């Protein structure tokens, strides 16, 4: 009897990528290197990976120069709702918090 071997179809990568872009992924990472009480290095990573359609549905901001008419049309957002996607208010800032 032969040993079972893992199988992989050609569509695995494409299907995984499609699912990832359809649902979206958010990565948050905080890395700190310290010696004693002294922080030597600090890295904060915030990344969101999604298709334009998914990002528009969740109201994420887009880089300058993005053709927002195509994005809202692809996301199925109504013209009235597109203002909420196109014109996001800036997040409130807290002065003196540092």
Curated annotation (Swiss-Prot):
Ranges in coiled-coil conformation: none
Lineage top rank: taxon: Archaea
Annotated signal sequence range: none
UniProt keyword annotation of Oxidoreductase present: no
Keywords: Gas vesicle, Plasmid
Swiss-Prot/TrEMBL induction comment: In PHH4 (a deletion of the p-vac locus) transcribed in all growth phases, maximal expression in mid-stationary phase. An unstable 6kb transcript able to cover gvpD-gvpE-gvpF-gvpG-gvpH-gvpI-gvpJ-gvpK-gvpL-gvpM is detected, as well as smaller transcripts. Gas vesicles appear earlier when grown in static culture, possibly due to O(2)-limitation.
GO molecular-function term, one example from the UniProt record: structural molecule activity
Residue ranges, compositional bias (Basic and acidic residues): 80-90
Entry annotated with the keyword Lipid metabolism: no
Pfam families listed in its UniProt record: Gas_vesicle
CC per GO annotation: gas vesicle; vesicle membrane
First-listed, main subcellular location of the protein, grouped into a coarse class: other
Disordered as annotated region, ranges: 75-98
Spans traversing the lipid bilayer: none
Annotated compartments: Gas vesicle
Function description: A minor component of the gas vesicle. Proteins GvpF to GvpM might be involved in nucleating gas vesicle formation. Gas vesicles are hollow, gas filled proteinaceous nanostructures found in several microbial planktonic microorganisms. They allow positioning of halobacteria at the optimal depth for growth in the poorly aerated, shallow brine pools of their habitat.
Family per record: Belongs to the gas vesicle GvpA family.
Subunit architecture: GvpF to GvpM interact with each other in vitro, and may form multi-subunit complex(es). Interacts with GvpA.
Note in the entry: Encoded in a 14-gene locus called c-vac which produces cylindrical gas vesicles only in the stationary growth phase.
The protein's name in its UniProt record: Gas vesicle protein J2
Encoding gene (name): gvpJ2
